[in-house]
Amino acid sequence: MMTREVHAFVYSALPSRVIFGAGRRADVAAELARLGCARPLIVTTHDQRMLGEALAHPFRDASLFSDATMHTPWEVTQRALHEIGRTRADCVIAIGGGSSIGLSKALALQTDLPQIVLPTTYAGSEVTPIIGETRDGEKRTQRTPKVLPEVVIYDVELTLSLPLAMSVASGLNAIAHAVEALYAEDRNPITSMMAEEAIASLAKALPDIAHTSDSIDARRLAQYGAWLGGTCLGMVGMGLHHKICHVLGGTFDLPHAQTHAVMLAHVVAYNAAAAPHAMTSIARALHTKDAWSGLHDLAKSLGAPLSLAALGMPEAGIDHALELVMRNAYSNPRAPEARALRIMLERAWKGLPPATAD
């Protein structure tokens, strides 16, 4: 007979309303009315401006801001705040990935306006109370319920045009959320179950997307996994992996999802001996012998980037990155050790497989 042990824990459910299903972007009007809003500012990126325009079309008093960009630069937030003042917007609707959602959160932080978010990637930011903003060349992250969207609409049809390379990187980013939830200091049985399900769902969906990129079933499963992974991250603290990715992205302007894709297996290998139960859960979800090799092999099989050099990070930047990572490091199963982290960053820069030994 299998025995189970449950220790003391704290579980706080997130307050966002989640709507999931194909075609559910049609619910935006009803959700606006439910929130008592009529003048939305729709935020998106330049590349997804047409999606924003289509979303704005039915609303007489909607306005559009399409300058969202990576890592939520404060200068962009200031311009969007000016647009809110000019149009007297009473809510924010974000359509897009982490750039659009990050800007929406930044606006909510400054204004307390309600948010409706329609994700088009698997980043998961839409269900976390976490915001990262870049000022003076450094990305700073904080956790506050003020940035949680009131409504999240997962419409799988919005992900069908997501290019394969971005689908892969974004999906691995979502897996990273779930992985870190499994060894978070404040983890609990609920988030651990959700995290393992997220990893398993994404590990099944991403190869299917790589084979048939317009598969509704595969895209739906990936979106489901991304929701679970993001939700886990929203409920527990971030670890070393997210600290490193925020440092690398904010300092060297590296693409967010791709940086996660490169670093994930390396950080898991770094933490392996200190988090054996998490390693077992990850390997079980991946159907592999060990967690770090399974994650590396998955990324490699999907054609994901494997080196920081390929993303544009200079080798000379490793020292500066290490200094920033060691400063105010997040809670992590294994304490940050400068020598071991340097070796890890060097291997990640070169695109070598992860290694558990110092």
Language model regions located:
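Active-site segments that bind and position negatively charged phosphate/pyrophosphate groups
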Residues: 185-294
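ATP/NTP phosphate-donor binding region
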Residues: 1-90, 308
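A glycine/threonine-rich phosphate-anchoring loop and its flanking beta-alpha core
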Residues: 16, 109-190, 198, 278-281
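A short, small-residue-rich loop immediately preceding and capping a beta-strand
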Residues: 84-107, 111-122, 244
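Short glycine/serine/threonine-rich phosphate/pyrophosphate-binding segments
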Residues: 25-29, 48-52, 74, 99-106, ...
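Solvent-exposed alpha-helices and their adjacent loops that cap or buttress functional pockets
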Residues: 10-12, 34-35, 84-87, 108-110, ...
